[in-house]
């Protein structure tokens, strides 16, 4: 569950309760005001002074096993919850299954591949290609959309992983 980092504490509290989150990873500013969540494991990234003595992300990562245990997942199992803007009250949690996400990514990959093939065929019509060993341009993306939105998560972040393109995160 990716929560909007611009939310005020009441909205964050709502998202945590609604999603039944067990762990919260955030910076000190985002973790302030959430003391009432005593059952929630809070992990701080980029600690400035960590006056609350929270577990740091580095410690959290170092304490984990070298390998993951196998989990039984079905393609129709829920994978993510993204929250709407909440224009008519509190934000609504929108579920996506593993199948939803993979179908979206594969359809984008297919469209992108087909588009490149068509463009290459059109631009190379009647031309002879000779390789001179010149470096090939690397595909890259300047990622400026928040990861808590499906556009940033899926079309920016996940598609970049599938496409093998360089990501520059803002």
Region roles according to the model:
Residues 1-23, 92-95, 166-170:
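Short beta-strand->loop structural element characteristic of the AMP-binding/adenylate-forming
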Residues 20-23, 38-51, 135, 139-142, ...:
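Conserved helix-loop-beta element of the AMP-binding
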Residues 24, 78, 84-87, 101, ...:
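Conserved S/T- and glycine-rich ATP-binding loop of Class I adenylate-forming
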Residues 29-75, 90, 99-102:
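ANL superfamily adenylate-forming
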Residues 65-83, 90, 116-120, 131-140:
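Conserved pre-ATP/AMP-binding loop-to-beta segment of ANL
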Residues 96-97, 156:
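Active-site loop-to-helix junction immediately N-terminal to the catalytic Tyr of the SDR YXXXK motif
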Residues 102-143, 148-170:
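Conserved AMP-binding/adenylation subdomain of ANL enzymes
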